[in-house]
Amino acid sequence: MRVRRRGLRMSGAGCLAMVLLAGCGMGSGSDKGEVVLRVVAADYGEGPLDSSTTFWKHLAYRYGKANPGVRVEVTVLSWNDVDAKVAEMVEKGRAPDIAQIGAYADFAAAGKLYPADELLSVRTEADLLAPLADAGRVHGDQYGLPFVASTRLMFYNTDLLEDAGVIAKGAAWQPRTWAELTAAAKKLKENGVRTPIALPLGPEEAQAESMQWMLAGGGGITNDSEGYVIDSTANVKTFEYLRDDLVGAGLTGPDEPGGLDRRRAFEAFTDGQVGILNGHPTLVQQAHAKGIKLGMVPLPTTDGSEPRAMGVADWIMAFKNGHPKESGAFLDYLYEEKNVTAFTAKYGLLPVTTSGYRRMLDSDDPKTAPLKVFLRALPSSRLYPVGKKSWAGVSAEFKKSVGGAVAPDGRPADVLADIAESARKAEGTP
Protein backbone atom coordinates (compact mmCIF):
# COMPACT_ATOMS: atom_id res chain seq x y z
CA MET A 1 0.00 0.00 0.00
CA ARG A 2 2.62 2.43 -0.81
CA VAL A 3 2.08 6.10 -0.56
CA ARG A 4 4.53 6.80 -3.32
CA ARG A 5 4.62 10.22 -4.79
CA ARG A 6 3.57 8.43 -7.87
CA GLY A 7 0.89 7.64 -5.47
CA LEU A 8 2.34 9.77 -2.84
CA ARG A 9 5.94 9.32 -3.37
CA MET A 10 8.13 9.26 -6.41
CA SER A 11 11.35 7.35 -6.26
CA GLY A 12 14.52 9.35 -6.73
CA ALA A 13 16.38 9.02 -10.00
CA GLY A 14 15.27 5.38 -10.25
CA CYS A 15 18.70 4.11 -9.25
CA LEU A 16 20.01 2.93 -5.94
CA ALA A 17 20.67 5.85 -3.63
CA MET A 18 22.46 4.53 -0.59
CA VAL A 19 23.81 6.89 2.01
CA LEU A 20 25.12 6.02 5.45
CA LEU A 21 24.52 8.77 7.94
CA ALA A 22 26.11 9.41 11.33
CA GLY A 23 28.84 6.84 10.85
CA CYS A 24 29.34 3.55 9.07
CA GLY A 25 29.35 -0.16 9.82
CA MET A 26 26.62 -2.74 10.11
CA GLY A 27 26.92 -3.90 13.71
CA SER A 28 24.51 -3.14 16.55
CA GLY A 29 27.25 -2.20 18.96
CA SER A 30 30.57 -0.38 18.87
CA ASP A 31 33.95 -0.57 20.52
CA LYS A 32 32.98 2.57 22.42
CA GLY A 33 30.25 0.70 24.27
CA GLU A 34 27.47 2.64 22.59
CA VAL A 35 24.37 1.12 20.99
CA VAL A 36 24.25 1.54 17.22
CA LEU A 37 20.76 1.64 15.72
CA ARG A 38 20.70 0.75 12.04
CA VAL A 39 17.83 2.37 10.16
CA VAL A 40 16.86 1.80 6.53
CA ALA A 41 14.55 4.40 4.99
CA ALA A 42 12.99 5.14 1.61
CA ASP A 43 13.79 8.22 -0.43
CA TYR A 44 10.78 10.45 -1.16
CA GLY A 45 12.76 12.98 -3.16
CA GLU A 46 12.82 13.37 -6.91
CA GLY A 47 16.61 13.71 -7.00
CA PRO A 48 19.68 14.66 -4.96
CA LEU A 49 18.46 18.19 -4.26
CA ASP A 50 15.39 17.09 -2.30
CA SER A 51 16.47 13.64 -1.15
CA SER A 52 15.14 12.36 2.17
CA THR A 53 18.78 11.93 3.14
CA THR A 54 18.83 15.50 4.47
CA PHE A 55 15.90 14.90 6.83
CA TRP A 56 17.35 11.67 8.24
CA LYS A 57 20.86 13.11 8.53
CA HIS A 58 19.65 16.00 10.66
CA LEU A 59 17.32 13.77 12.68
CA ALA A 60 20.08 11.26 13.45
CA TYR A 61 22.53 14.02 14.36
CA ARG A 62 20.13 15.78 16.73
CA TYR A 63 19.10 12.53 18.38
CA GLY A 64 22.69 11.36 18.82
CA LYS A 65 23.69 14.67 20.35
CA ALA A 66 20.88 14.44 22.92
CA ASN A 67 21.49 10.72 23.58
CA PRO A 68 25.28 10.15 23.75
CA GLY A 69 24.95 6.41 24.41
CA VAL A 70 23.16 5.77 21.12
CA ARG A 71 24.40 6.25 17.56
CA VAL A 72 21.93 6.17 14.67
CA GLU A 73 23.09 5.03 11.25
CA VAL A 74 20.60 5.58 8.43
CA THR A 75 20.74 4.05 4.97
CA VAL A 76 18.49 5.85 2.48
CA LEU A 77 17.47 3.84 -0.60
CA SER A 78 15.31 4.56 -3.61
CA TRP A 79 11.77 3.21 -3.63
CA ASN A 80 12.79 0.95 -6.49
CA ASP A 81 15.10 -0.94 -4.16
CA VAL A 82 14.23 -0.44 -0.51
CA ASP A 83 11.62 -3.18 0.01
CA ALA A 84 13.71 -5.82 -1.72
CA LYS A 85 16.87 -4.71 0.08
CA VAL A 86 15.26 -4.97 3.52
CA ALA A 87 13.82 -8.40 2.65
CA GLU A 88 17.30 -9.50 1.58
CA MET A 89 18.84 -8.20 4.80
CA VAL A 90 16.26 -10.08 6.87
CA GLU A 91 16.80 -13.28 4.90
CA LYS A 92 20.55 -13.07 5.53
CA GLY A 93 20.03 -12.52 9.26
CA ARG A 94 21.15 -8.90 9.10
CA ALA A 95 17.84 -7.12 9.58
CA PRO A 96 18.05 -3.41 10.41
CA ASP A 97 16.81 -2.26 13.79
CA ILE A 98 14.24 -0.01 12.11
CA ALA A 99 12.92 -0.01 8.54
CA GLN A 100 10.73 2.58 6.84
CA ILE A 101 9.29 0.80 3.81
CA GLY A 102 6.04 -0.07 2.06
CA ALA A 103 4.75 -3.16 3.89
CA TYR A 104 5.17 -4.96 7.18
CA ALA A 105 2.75 -7.93 7.20
CA ASP A 106 5.19 -10.62 6.03
CA PHE A 107 7.72 -9.67 8.70
CA ALA A 108 5.04 -9.56 11.39
CA ALA A 109 3.70 -12.97 10.37
CA ALA A 110 7.22 -14.39 10.62
CA GLY A 111 7.59 -13.07 14.18
CA LYS A 112 10.40 -10.68 13.21
CA LEU A 113 8.94 -7.44 14.60
CA TYR A 114 8.42 -5.86 18.00
CA PRO A 115 4.82 -4.87 18.76
CA ALA A 116 4.19 -1.17 19.28
CA ASP A 117 3.44 -1.55 22.98
CA GLU A 118 7.01 -2.80 23.53
CA LEU A 119 8.43 0.21 21.72
CA LEU A 120 6.46 3.42 21.98
CA SER A 121 5.57 5.54 24.95
CA VAL A 122 1.88 5.65 25.81
CA ARG A 123 1.79 9.27 24.65
CA THR A 124 3.24 8.48 21.23
CA GLU A 125 1.06 5.43 20.69
CA ALA A 126 -2.06 7.39 21.61
CA ASP A 127 -1.09 10.20 19.22
CA LEU A 128 -1.25 7.98 16.11
CA LEU A 129 -4.43 8.57 14.10
CA ALA A 130 -6.81 5.70 14.78
CA PRO A 131 -7.56 4.44 11.24
CA LEU A 132 -3.86 4.39 10.42
CA ALA A 133 -2.88 2.69 13.66
CA ASP A 134 -5.63 0.10 13.17
CA ALA A 135 -4.31 -0.69 9.69
CA GLY A 136 -1.00 -1.57 11.31
CA ARG A 137 -2.47 -4.38 13.40
CA VAL A 138 -2.11 -8.11 12.90
CA HIS A 139 -4.46 -10.25 15.02
CA GLY A 140 -5.06 -7.27 17.29
CA ASP A 141 -1.41 -6.37 17.92
CA GLN A 142 0.17 -3.38 16.22
CA TYR A 143 3.39 -4.10 14.34
CA GLY A 144 3.20 -1.58 11.51
CA LEU A 145 3.60 2.05 12.53
CA PRO A 146 2.27 4.59 10.00
CA PHE A 147 4.96 6.93 8.72
CA VAL A 148 3.20 9.20 6.21
CA ALA A 149 -0.24 9.09 4.64
CA SER A 150 -2.48 10.39 1.89
CA THR A 151 -6.11 10.17 0.88
CA ARG A 152 -7.75 10.01 -2.52
CA LEU A 153 -10.36 12.47 -3.77
CA MET A 154 -12.21 13.20 -6.99
CA PHE A 155 -10.63 15.94 -9.13
CA TYR A 156 -12.40 17.99 -11.78
CA ASN A 157 -11.23 20.47 -14.40
CA THR A 158 -13.04 23.69 -13.51
CA ASP A 159 -12.84 25.24 -16.98
CA LEU A 160 -14.19 22.13 -18.71
CA LEU A 161 -17.13 21.88 -16.31
CA GLU A 162 -17.92 25.58 -16.71
CA ASP A 163 -17.75 25.40 -20.50
CA ALA A 164 -20.08 22.37 -20.52
CA GLY A 165 -22.62 24.09 -18.28
CA VAL A 166 -22.14 21.70 -15.37
CA ILE A 167 -21.33 24.58 -13.02
CA ALA A 168 -21.64 28.35 -13.24
CA LYS A 169 -18.47 30.37 -13.71
CA GLY A 170 -16.62 30.66 -10.43
CA ALA A 171 -18.87 28.15 -8.67
CA ALA A 172 -17.77 25.06 -6.77
CA TRP A 173 -19.09 21.58 -7.47
CA GLN A 174 -19.98 18.72 -5.17
CA PRO A 175 -22.15 16.02 -6.70
CA ARG A 176 -23.84 13.88 -4.08
CA THR A 177 -24.93 10.87 -6.13
CA TRP A 178 -23.75 8.81 -9.06
CA ALA A 179 -26.76 10.05 -11.02
CA GLU A 180 -25.43 13.62 -10.72
CA LEU A 181 -21.96 12.44 -11.69
CA THR A 182 -23.29 10.64 -14.77
CA ALA A 183 -25.30 13.69 -15.82
CA ALA A 184 -22.19 15.88 -15.59
CA ALA A 185 -20.16 13.40 -17.64
CA LYS A 186 -22.81 13.40 -20.36
CA LYS A 187 -22.64 17.19 -20.61
CA LEU A 188 -18.86 17.02 -20.88
CA LYS A 189 -19.13 14.48 -23.68
CA GLU A 190 -21.70 16.59 -25.53
CA ASN A 191 -19.30 19.54 -25.28
CA GLY A 192 -16.50 17.60 -26.96
CA VAL A 193 -14.37 16.66 -23.95
CA ARG A 194 -12.15 13.74 -24.97
CA THR A 195 -12.47 11.88 -21.66
CA PRO A 196 -15.37 13.01 -19.47
CA ILE A 197 -14.41 10.58 -16.67
CA ALA A 198 -11.09 8.74 -16.62
CA LEU A 199 -11.30 5.21 -15.21
CA PRO A 200 -7.74 3.87 -14.82
CA LEU A 201 -8.19 0.18 -14.08
CA GLY A 202 -4.91 -0.77 -15.72
CA PRO A 203 -2.18 -2.74 -13.96
CA GLU A 204 -0.43 0.23 -12.33
CA GLU A 205 -2.96 0.87 -9.57
CA ALA A 206 -6.23 -0.91 -10.35
CA GLN A 207 -6.66 -1.89 -6.70
CA ALA A 208 -6.81 1.78 -5.66
CA GLU A 209 -9.33 2.83 -8.31
CA SER A 210 -11.43 -0.24 -7.51
CA MET A 211 -11.44 0.40 -3.79
CA GLN A 212 -12.49 4.03 -4.21
CA TRP A 213 -15.51 3.06 -6.28
CA MET A 214 -16.33 0.13 -3.99
CA LEU A 215 -16.42 2.39 -0.95
CA ALA A 216 -18.61 4.89 -2.78
CA GLY A 217 -20.95 2.05 -3.71
CA GLY A 218 -21.43 0.98 -0.10
CA GLY A 219 -18.99 -1.91 -0.26
CA GLY A 220 -15.25 -2.31 0.02
CA ILE A 221 -12.47 -4.84 -0.21
CA THR A 222 -12.94 -5.93 3.42
CA ASN A 223 -15.66 -5.53 6.03
CA ASP A 224 -15.25 -3.98 9.47
CA SER A 225 -13.88 -7.29 10.74
CA GLU A 226 -11.21 -7.24 7.99
CA GLY A 227 -12.75 -10.21 6.21
CA TYR A 228 -12.65 -10.11 2.41
CA VAL A 229 -15.98 -9.12 0.80
CA ILE A 230 -14.70 -8.54 -2.72
CA ASP A 231 -17.62 -10.28 -4.44
CA SER A 232 -20.35 -8.70 -2.30
CA THR A 233 -23.61 -7.61 -3.89
CA ALA A 234 -22.70 -3.95 -3.36
CA ASN A 235 -19.38 -4.37 -5.16
CA VAL A 236 -20.96 -6.24 -8.07
CA LYS A 237 -23.52 -3.44 -8.48
CA THR A 238 -20.71 -0.87 -8.41
CA PHE A 239 -18.91 -2.50 -11.32
CA GLU A 240 -22.16 -2.96 -13.21
CA TYR A 241 -22.67 0.81 -12.91
CA LEU A 242 -19.15 1.46 -14.18
CA ARG A 243 -19.63 -0.96 -17.07
CA ASP A 244 -23.10 0.18 -18.13
CA ASP A 245 -23.49 3.83 -17.14
CA LEU A 246 -19.94 5.07 -17.69
CA VAL A 247 -17.96 2.80 -20.03
CA GLY A 248 -20.96 1.55 -22.00
CA ALA A 249 -22.28 5.08 -22.42
CA GLY A 250 -18.98 6.25 -23.88
CA LEU A 251 -18.21 8.52 -20.93
CA THR A 252 -14.73 7.17 -20.16
CA GLY A 253 -13.07 8.27 -23.38
CA PRO A 254 -11.29 6.26 -26.07
CA ASP A 255 -8.99 4.33 -23.72
CA GLU A 256 -10.13 0.96 -22.43
CA PRO A 257 -10.14 1.20 -18.60
CA GLY A 258 -8.29 -2.10 -18.29
CA GLY A 259 -5.41 -0.71 -20.32
CA LEU A 260 -5.30 2.76 -18.77
CA ASP A 261 -2.79 3.37 -15.98
CA ARG A 262 -3.11 6.20 -13.49
CA ARG A 263 0.05 7.87 -14.74
CA ARG A 264 -1.38 8.29 -18.25
CA ALA A 265 -4.72 9.41 -16.82
CA PHE A 266 -2.95 12.08 -14.78
CA GLU A 267 -1.00 13.24 -17.82
CA ALA A 268 -4.22 13.54 -19.81
CA PHE A 269 -5.81 15.54 -16.98
CA THR A 270 -2.90 17.97 -16.83
CA ASP A 271 -3.15 18.31 -20.63
CA GLY A 272 -6.77 19.42 -20.28
CA GLN A 273 -8.24 16.29 -21.90
CA VAL A 274 -10.00 14.81 -18.84
CA GLY A 275 -12.95 16.33 -17.03
CA ILE A 276 -13.13 14.15 -13.91
CA LEU A 277 -10.93 11.52 -12.27
CA ASN A 278 -9.82 10.21 -8.90
CA GLY A 279 -6.45 11.41 -7.67
CA HIS A 280 -4.06 12.18 -4.84
CA PRO A 281 -2.11 15.26 -3.68
CA THR A 282 0.68 14.94 -6.23
CA LEU A 283 -1.81 15.68 -9.00
CA VAL A 284 -2.45 19.11 -7.48
CA GLN A 285 1.16 20.12 -8.07
CA GLN A 286 1.25 18.59 -11.55
CA ALA A 287 -1.96 20.31 -12.65
CA HIS A 288 -1.02 23.71 -11.26
CA ALA A 289 2.34 23.50 -13.02
CA LYS A 290 0.43 23.29 -16.33
CA GLY A 291 -2.08 26.00 -15.46
CA ILE A 292 -5.05 23.68 -14.95
CA LYS A 293 -7.75 25.08 -12.68
CA LEU A 294 -9.19 22.27 -10.60
CA GLY A 295 -11.49 21.34 -7.77
CA MET A 296 -11.21 18.45 -5.33
CA VAL A 297 -14.19 16.80 -3.64
CA PRO A 298 -15.10 13.41 -2.17
CA LEU A 299 -16.23 10.86 -4.74
CA PRO A 300 -20.05 10.87 -4.60
CA THR A 301 -21.87 7.78 -3.40
CA THR A 302 -24.46 5.71 -5.16
CA ASP A 303 -27.29 6.98 -2.95
CA GLY A 304 -26.07 10.33 -1.64
CA SER A 305 -24.94 8.98 1.72
CA GLU A 306 -21.86 10.35 3.48
CA PRO A 307 -18.75 9.47 1.45
CA ARG A 308 -15.78 7.66 2.95
CA ALA A 309 -12.37 8.33 1.46
CA MET A 310 -9.68 5.80 0.75
CA GLY A 311 -6.46 6.30 2.66
CA VAL A 312 -2.93 5.16 1.86
CA ALA A 313 0.05 4.90 4.21
CA ASP A 314 3.69 3.92 4.29
CA TRP A 315 5.09 2.07 7.28
CA ILE A 316 7.89 1.97 9.79
CA MET A 317 8.73 -1.08 11.92
CA ALA A 318 11.29 -2.29 14.43
CA PHE A 319 12.96 -5.68 14.07
CA LYS A 320 13.78 -7.93 17.00
CA ASN A 321 17.48 -7.15 17.24
CA GLY A 322 17.68 -6.86 21.01
CA HIS A 323 17.22 -3.09 21.24
CA PRO A 324 13.51 -2.47 21.89
CA LYS A 325 14.23 0.30 24.40
CA GLU A 326 16.63 2.20 22.15
CA SER A 327 14.52 1.66 19.03
CA GLY A 328 11.39 2.79 20.84
CA ALA A 329 13.04 5.93 22.19
CA PHE A 330 14.24 6.88 18.71
CA LEU A 331 10.75 6.28 17.30
CA ASP A 332 9.27 8.46 20.04
CA TYR A 333 11.61 11.21 18.87
CA LEU A 334 10.74 10.64 15.22
CA TYR A 335 7.04 11.03 16.02
CA GLU A 336 7.44 14.37 17.78
CA GLU A 337 5.23 16.95 16.12
CA LYS A 338 8.09 19.08 14.76
CA ASN A 339 9.66 16.10 13.02
CA VAL A 340 6.41 14.72 11.62
CA THR A 341 5.35 18.05 10.16
CA ALA A 342 8.81 18.89 8.82
CA PHE A 343 8.80 15.74 6.70
CA THR A 344 5.20 15.93 5.50
CA ALA A 345 5.48 19.63 4.62
CA LYS A 346 8.59 19.02 2.55
CA TYR A 347 7.03 16.27 0.44
CA GLY A 348 3.37 17.29 0.32
CA LEU A 349 2.20 14.35 2.42
CA LEU A 350 -0.18 14.03 5.37
CA PRO A 351 0.83 13.59 9.02
CA VAL A 352 -0.08 10.36 10.78
CA THR A 353 -0.39 11.79 14.29
CA THR A 354 -3.20 13.76 15.89
CA SER A 355 -0.79 16.53 16.90
CA GLY A 356 0.59 16.78 13.36
CA TYR A 357 -2.93 16.68 11.93
CA ARG A 358 -4.03 19.61 14.08
CA ARG A 359 -0.93 21.61 13.30
CA MET A 360 -1.40 21.25 9.55
CA LEU A 361 -5.11 21.98 9.80
CA ASP A 362 -4.43 25.20 11.75
CA SER A 363 -1.51 26.28 9.56
CA ASP A 364 -1.68 29.55 7.61
CA ASP A 365 1.09 28.43 5.26
CA PRO A 366 -0.31 28.75 1.70
CA LYS A 367 1.66 25.65 0.68
CA THR A 368 -0.50 23.48 2.94
CA ALA A 369 -3.83 24.93 1.79
CA PRO A 370 -4.36 22.45 -1.09
CA LEU A 371 -3.61 19.54 1.26
CA LYS A 372 -6.27 20.41 3.82
CA VAL A 373 -9.12 18.86 1.87
CA PHE A 374 -7.14 15.59 1.78
CA LEU A 375 -6.27 16.01 5.45
CA ARG A 376 -9.89 16.39 6.56
CA ALA A 377 -10.73 13.07 4.93
CA LEU A 378 -7.92 11.20 6.68
CA PRO A 379 -9.40 10.42 10.15
CA SER A 380 -12.39 8.57 8.68
CA SER A 381 -10.58 7.03 5.72
CA ARG A 382 -10.47 3.34 4.92
CA LEU A 383 -7.11 1.74 4.13
CA TYR A 384 -6.04 -1.35 2.27
CA PRO A 385 -5.98 -4.52 4.42
CA VAL A 386 -2.20 -4.33 4.67
CA GLY A 387 -2.19 -6.36 7.88
CA LYS A 388 -3.10 -9.40 5.81
CA LYS A 389 -0.19 -11.40 4.48
CA SER A 390 -2.42 -12.27 1.52
CA TRP A 391 -2.92 -8.65 0.46
CA ALA A 392 0.04 -8.45 -1.91
CA GLY A 393 -1.33 -11.35 -3.94
CA VAL A 394 -4.89 -10.05 -3.86
CA SER A 395 -3.71 -6.63 -5.02
CA ALA A 396 -1.92 -8.31 -7.91
CA GLU A 397 -5.15 -10.10 -8.88
CA PHE A 398 -6.97 -6.76 -9.05
CA LYS A 399 -4.26 -5.34 -11.28
CA LYS A 400 -4.38 -8.35 -13.57
CA SER A 401 -8.09 -8.86 -14.07
CA VAL A 402 -10.48 -6.25 -12.65
CA GLY A 403 -10.36 -4.10 -15.79
CA GLY A 404 -12.16 -6.91 -17.61
CA ALA A 405 -15.20 -6.43 -15.38
CA VAL A 406 -16.09 -3.16 -17.13
CA ALA A 407 -15.41 -4.28 -20.70
CA PRO A 408 -18.48 -4.30 -22.98
CA ASP A 409 -18.82 -8.06 -22.49
CA GLY A 410 -17.50 -7.99 -18.93
CA ARG A 411 -19.16 -9.97 -16.16
CA PRO A 412 -18.48 -8.16 -12.87
CA ALA A 413 -19.92 -10.94 -10.72
CA ASP A 414 -17.60 -13.52 -12.27
CA VAL A 415 -14.49 -11.33 -12.22
CA LEU A 416 -14.98 -10.33 -8.60
CA ALA A 417 -15.81 -13.92 -7.63
CA ASP A 418 -12.51 -15.09 -9.12
CA ILE A 419 -10.54 -12.45 -7.20
CA ALA A 420 -12.46 -13.30 -4.03
CA GLU A 421 -11.71 -17.00 -4.46
CA SER A 422 -8.00 -16.23 -4.76
CA ALA A 423 -8.22 -14.12 -1.61
CA ARG A 424 -9.98 -16.86 0.34
CA LYS A 425 -7.43 -19.46 -0.73
CA ALA A 426 -4.59 -17.17 0.31
CA GLU A 427 -6.26 -16.67 3.67
CA GLY A 428 -7.02 -20.35 4.09
CA THR A 429 -10.73 -19.64 4.52
CA PRO A 430 -13.67 -21.35 2.78
Q: Residue ranges of each PLM-predicted region?
A:
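Hinge/lid segment of periplasmic solute-binding proteins
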Residues: 102-153, 182, 209, 295-297
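Extracytoplasmic "Venus flytrap"/periplasmic binding protein-like
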Residues: 65-128, 144, 163-165, 267-268, ...
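C-terminal capping/gating helix-and-loop segments adjacent to ligand/active sites or protein-protein/ligand interfaces
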Residues: 349, 370-422
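Short, solvent-exposed loop/beta-turn-alpha elements that line the ligand-binding surface or hinge
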Residues: 118-128, 170-174, 196-201, 219-238, ...
